[in-house]
């Protein structure tokens, strides 16, 4: 039976395609926009049945051109939180997603899609409930508005709808994202280029490098998607994070120590790395004051209640794996 992955050449989409391949699934239609042509590299080691541009996909899918489709993993979106073209963002992330959803509902196709923790904005609690949702940018609003649509249609839906609010995802196949790539990716490249990693200094009551995020490996993101694919009776909107808030210092020290280990050098504590100039703190930029989240942490209650009980990689585990993968790509 056919599977469809939108955003298939992107970061999370390509990892889902690869994870499906590892289970023997190759009847996959990859949908994307390759205007940024170098994204094709994310699919070079993947097996797919067909490729379609996003502009032709929805109409053909709604028309039934692909026969029986078991599931759509809808990962295609503009994920640039700095994008200021609201019309583009709403058309790409909201209108397009509604069209894919409508086609899935009409055909009884499982619909698993990418939501975002950006929906929570400046909230201090990260629970899948309306009172905690206050997006700070048009990207977050586009995701929020689509989740509101999902809440309205889910009670009457005859097929699965599962949305995942991704927290700070890092891992292989993100290099095309540029400035929107993960902190781990940028720390890796900065350390190789300059011999040190730079982090923000003290801000808003948090010490240097102590601002925290829920950093989640794309390995775990793919696993959660496939778990719900295997359990089509489970619908809902779910936070997809580790449930742990870890400081940027943890990312930096893990990147540095993994690269040191690859060169046969011993691990160092954070204090030792700072003392040796391997980690450096820079003044917090004025442009980000009042617009910066110093803390995110996924509430996993809904996810765990739905039956997902596997552990999540810590920053130390996941970033170590990722740095070794990046090093192997050099």
Swiss-Prot record:
Reaction(s) this enzyme catalyzes, per UniProt: ADP-D-glycero-beta-D-manno-heptose = ADP-L-glycero-beta-D-manno-heptose
Pathway as given in its UniProt record = Nucleotide-sugar biosynthesis; ADP-L-glycero-beta-D-manno-heptose biosynthesis; ADP-L-glycero-beta-D-manno-heptose from D-glycero-beta-D-manno-heptose 7-phosphate: step 4/4
* Reported cofactor(s): NADP(+)
- Which BP terms does GO give this entry? ADP-L-glycero-beta-D-manno-heptose biosynthetic process; carbohydrate metabolic process
Show the GO MF annotations.
ADP-glyceromanno-heptose 6-epimerase activity; NADP binding
Query: Electron transport: is it a keyword of this entry?
Result: no
Gene3D superfamilies in the record: NAD(P)-binding Rossmann-like Domain, UDP-galactose 4-epimerase, domain 1
* Positions with a binding annotation for substrate: 168, 179, 186, 200-203, 213, 292
> Cross-referenced HAMAP family, in alphabetical order?
Heptose_epimerase
Relate the protein's function as given in its record.
Answer: Catalyzes the interconversion between ADP-D-glycero-beta-D-manno-heptose and ADP-L-glycero-beta-D-manno-heptose via an epimerization at carbon 6 of the heptose.
> What does UniProt say about this protein's domains?
Contains a large N-terminal NADP-binding domain, and a smaller C-terminal substrate-binding domain.
User: What NCBIfam families is this protein classified in?
Assistant: heptose_epim (TIGR02197)
* Name of the protein in its database record: ADP-L-glycero-D-manno-heptose-6-epimerase
What's the source species for this entry? Burkholderia pseudomallei (strain K96243)
């Amino acid at each position: 039976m056919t599977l469809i992955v939108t955003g298939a050449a992107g970061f999370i989409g390509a990892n889902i395609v690869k994870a499906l391949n590892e289970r023997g699934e190759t009847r996959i239609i990859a949908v994307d926009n390759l205007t940024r042509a170098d994204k094709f590299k994310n699919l070079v080691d993947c097996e797919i049945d067909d490729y379609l541009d996003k502009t032709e996909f929805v109409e053909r899918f709604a028309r039934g051109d692909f026969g029986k489709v078991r599931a759509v993993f809808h990962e295609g979106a503009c994920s640039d939180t700095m994008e200021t073209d609201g019309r583009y963002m709403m058309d790409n992330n909201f209108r397009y997603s509604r069209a894919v959803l409508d086609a899935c509902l009409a055909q009884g196709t499982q619909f698993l899609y990418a939501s975002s923790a950006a929906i929570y904005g400046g909230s201090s609690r990260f629970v899948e409930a309306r009172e905690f949702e206050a997006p700070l940018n048009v990207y977050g609003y586009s995701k929020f508005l689509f989740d509101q649509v999902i809440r309205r249609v889910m009670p009457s839906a005859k097929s699965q709808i599962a949305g995942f609010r991704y927290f700070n995802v890092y891992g292989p196949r993100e290099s095309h994202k540029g400035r929107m790539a993960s902190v781990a990716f940028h720390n890796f490249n900065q350390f190789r280029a300059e011999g040190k990693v730079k982090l923000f200094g003290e801000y808003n009551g948090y010490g240097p490098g102590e601002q925290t995020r829920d950093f989640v490996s794309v390995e775990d993101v793919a696993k959660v998607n496939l778990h719900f694919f295997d359990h089509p009776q489970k619908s809902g909107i779910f936070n997809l994070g580790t449930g742990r808030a870890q400081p940027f210092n943890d990312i930096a020290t893990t990147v540095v120590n993994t690269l040191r280990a690859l060169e046969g050098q011993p691990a160092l504590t954070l204090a030792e790395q700072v003392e040796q100039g391997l980690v450096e703190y820079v003044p917090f930029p004025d442009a980000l004051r009042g617009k910066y989240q110093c803390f995110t942490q996924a509430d996993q209650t809904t996810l765990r209640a739905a039956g997902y009980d596997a552990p999540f990689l810590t920053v130390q585990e996941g970033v170590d794996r990722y740095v070794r993968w990046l090093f192997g790509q050099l």
